[in-house]
Swiss-Prot record:
Keywords of this entry: ATP-binding, Ligase, Nucleotide-binding, Protein biosynthesis
Top-rank taxon, per record: Bacteria
Similarity comment: family membership: Belongs to the GatC family.
Leading EC class: ligase
Quaternary structure and partners: Heterotrimer of A, B and C subunits.
Protein name: Glutamyl-tRNA(Gln) amidotransferase subunit C
EC assignment: 6.3.5.-
Taxonomic lineage from the root: Bacteria, Pseudomonadati, Pseudomonadota, Betaproteobacteria, Burkholderiales
């Protein structure tokens, strides 16, 4: 997928971003390089490769890996909501400010 200069200018217009011709040309080059890289990655045969939950596992030492998720604090929502003027179903009720 290759973009053209008119595509970059259209995207900038839709995003309400003002870009000069030089910036548009530079952005076009960068986007086309990015799309080329994506196409190369999509061409790689990944059948039989197990997806990784966290790719960082491949570069970090075992001692620095992400810790297991565990509850470390008790649920004190009811305690915190006792001082609220109005709550319902565990949510804080606030006055309507937008008409």
């Amino acid at each position: 997928m290759a973009l053209e200069l008119s595509d970059v200018k259209r995207i900038a217009h839709l995003a309400r971003i003002e870009v000069s011709d030089g910036e548009a040309a530079q952005t076009l080059t960068q986007l086309n390089q990015f799309f080329t890289l994506v196409e190369q990655m999509q061409a790689v045969d990944t059948t039989g490769i197990e997806p990784m939950a966290h790719p960082i596992e491949q570069v970090q030492a075992p001692a620095q890996r992400l810790r297991e998720d565990a509850v470390t604090e008790p649920d004190r929502r009811a305690d915190y909501q006792q001082c609220a003027p109005s709550t319902e179903a565990g949510l804080y009720l606030v006055p309507k400010v937008i008409e």
